[in-house]
Amino acid sequence: MKVTTLTLALLFIPCFEANAQRSMNVITYNIRYNNPGDNENSWPNRREDVLKLLKVHKADIFTVQEALYDQMLNLKDGMKGFDYVGVGRDDGNVNGEFSAVFYNSNRFLLMENGTFWLSKTPKVPSKSWDAALNRICTWARLKEIETHKTFYVFNTHFDHQGVIARKKSALLILKKIGEIAQRKEPIILTGDFNLTPEEKPLMLIRQKLKDSRQVSVAAPKGPIGTFNGFDFQSKLESRIDYLFVNKYVEVDNYHVLTDSRAGRYPSDHLPVLIEVQIK
């Protein structure tokens, strides 16, 4: 009888593990565009540091802002097993900055994807209102191979000058999320919003989605601020990079990463990592 009981118990263990939820690490990172004028902080001097950070923190999905095409190729080559979706904001192909979504292709399948412009004509490269530059939002619908769960990741970079443009962009993204993600599925919205938490466009977003810092099960780790300006002595008080989620995403951990080498950060922004479970 004891042998039978033990055998049954062992048989049930694999089933329990197979059905257990798997967490995933999602990182948003403004990697700073490849600007030779940055001198010692130029991309060739920090490229390997960015790649090391993504690997050390075991990113399953990471989103980038400001990435030029050569940087996209560096990331694709350096992160083996990762694919991406995204286009350059200036021509819908390879010109201009990307707001791309990278994903581990050994863990996820790409189901759908697209890019829209934060403008009055979102289907074509364009800018509107008081925006200084073309701005985009790239999205992907992914399926986890093991669990067959599907979810959406949206990634964006709001204008750095246009006050009206930032408000209109927030409203447009919420509208587009409603149109694209009509299924009751998990949603993660990431990006550099060029907004601090108390500003109205972010308040509009928080009416529909949850700020991952505020809903993290564990206490948030790291500084409040996410912009360092390549200043290693920065007080890190300016928070402009965010990950938002809907009710189908549980945020277990939130961490603003401060990895550095020889007194230098890999970018003028700090990456933000959340550990999540898809419900």
Please describe what each predicted stretch is.
Residues 2, 18-78, 89-97, 171, ...:
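N-terminal, active-site-proximal structural segment of metallo-dependent hydrolase catalytic domains
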Residues 63-65, 86-87, 188-192, 211-214:
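Active-site neighborhood of phospho(di)ester-bond hydrolases with catalytic His/Asp-centered motifs
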Residues 107, 164, 168, 175-187, ...:
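Metal-dependent phosphoester-hydrolase catalytic domains
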Residues 61, 65-154, 255-256:
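Structured beta-strand-rich core segments of catalytic domains in phosphoester-bond hydrolases
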Residues 28-48, 94, 118-132, 159, ...:
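Acidic/histidine-rich helix-loop elements
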Residues 23-35, 111-116, 149-158:
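Active-site-proximal beta-strand elements of phosphoester/diester hydrolases
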Residues 9-18:
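Hydrophobic h-region of N-terminal signal peptides that target proteins for export
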Residues 32, 68, 157-159, 193-196:
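Catalytic metal-binding/acid-base residues of hydrolase active sites
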